[in-house]
Design a protein with these regions (language model features):
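Secondary-structure boundary elements
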Residues: 1-48, 56-58, 120-125, 129-149
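Generic recognition of stable, solvent-exposed alpha-helical segments in well-folded globular domains
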Residues: 11-18, 52, 56, 65, ...
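Cysteine-centered nucleophilic/redox motifs
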Residues: 19, 46-74, 89-90
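Active-site rim recognition segments
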Residues: 21, 63, 76-77, 81-149
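Catalytic cysteine-centered active-site loop
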Residues: 29-32, 36, 70-80
């Protein structure tokens, strides 16, 4: 799947963008689940919440030789207007971790995303809930102010 989705390009940034588009286009969103599916299970159903999107995208990037990890934080949602817990992917490109979000489509990652922590998933077992524990310290206590120049 990774070879087909990445296309013929040899440029890692382009591969990541193509893989992100592929996951966004072919996966169906489902309600949040507390279990963390392995990529092999996600490929079979091609459905999941932000955690499955991030895990699959990270796995596809790694299959192309691109170091990647998942990120846990908050994303702005409009209904109701607030920041909600979310997971997306980062790829190591030219020595910098660059964010990609296959649940947001062409919108990508920007000011709508607030990173709290990241993981290679090598130390978490079974439950996606463990990854979201660091967010608990922010709930009900944090405010976000944007200053536009």
């Amino acid at each position: 799947m990774g070879i087909i989705a990445a296309g013929a390009t040899s440029i890692p940034q382009d591969k990541c963008q193509r893989l992100t588009r592929h996951v966004w286009k072919h996966m169906r969103l489902s309600p949040f689940s507390t279990s963390l599916q392995p990529a092999s299970g996600i490929i079979k159903t091609m459905r999941g919440d932000c955690t499955e999107h991030a895990v699959l995208l990270s796995t596809l990037m790694r299959s192309q030789g691109i170091p990647s990890r998942v990120v846990v934080g908050f994303v702005y949602v409009t209904n109701p207007a607030s920041y909600a817990p979310h997971m997306w992917t980062e790829a190591l490109l030219n020595g910098k971790w660059i964010p990609f979000d296959s649940t947001r489509g062409p919108a990508g990652v920007g000011l709508t995303h607030i990173k709290v922590t990241d993981s290679t998933l090598s130390d978490e077992v079974g439950s996606g809930t463990v990854l979201f524990v660091p967010l608990l310290s922010f709930l009900g206590r944090a405010t976000v102010d944007l200053a536009l120049d």
